[in-house]
Amino acid sequence: YRQGRDKVKGIQIVSTGKALPEEIITNDDLSRIVDTNDEWITTRTGIKKRYRCTQENTTSLAVRAAYEAVEASGVDIAEIGAVIVATSTADNAFPSTAAIVQKELGLAENVLAFDLSSACTGFLHALNVGQALFNSTDYKYILLIGSEQMSKILDYTDRSTCVLFGDGAGAVLIKAADNMYRQINYTRGDTDVLVCRGIGAQDAYVKMNGNAVFRFAVDVLKQGIDEILKKSDMTLDDIDYICLLYTSPSPRD
């Protein structure tokens, strides 16, 4: 363990990468397999299309996104100290998705590589872990990836869930930086309104209480934004973008 530092470092995003499967599933496509239509989906979610894997999986998407992020950075892969993959749909119990990414990218064998699972908040938790690693190690760069193949845990007869999710991956290469991004605030969560028992379980599909999720978003979103602005000594006029994970256009608007 390292001796503690007086100054906590933040993080800076160096580059990004993404990967999407080829197949596009439109709202009209879904209307042919479940009781729904384009107007119903668009009005309630704002979603027009989503992507679905046919030949790829969580791991291959993660590798592609990671490779794109590394290529865009111009960073020597020998300087990458860790790989963290946030996923709830890993293809293997082990080895981890991150370990496979490490191998496929040709990273050093002593690179720290592990997965974490925290559903919708997984990538944000990966950012927090990455920041913590910068403050406890000599790592120069860390590769963070969010990758999901949600299609393998969706019930395509359940219109409350199958319209919301798709497959894809995103990656960022981060480095330590003073006076940059850091965690400011957490809000509360719930363990009952969005559930997936797991691949291999008797009921392995995603189940969601949509009304409860909607009420949660409406009730908590403004409160959370107000708290963050207060802690940052900022106002809403200072903000250019707000990035939300949403299940309805109403909280977004």
Positions of the model-derived regions?
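Phosphate/pyrophosphate-binding loops at sites that engage ATP/ADP/AMP, CoA/4′-phosphopantetheine
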Residues: 65-80, 224-238
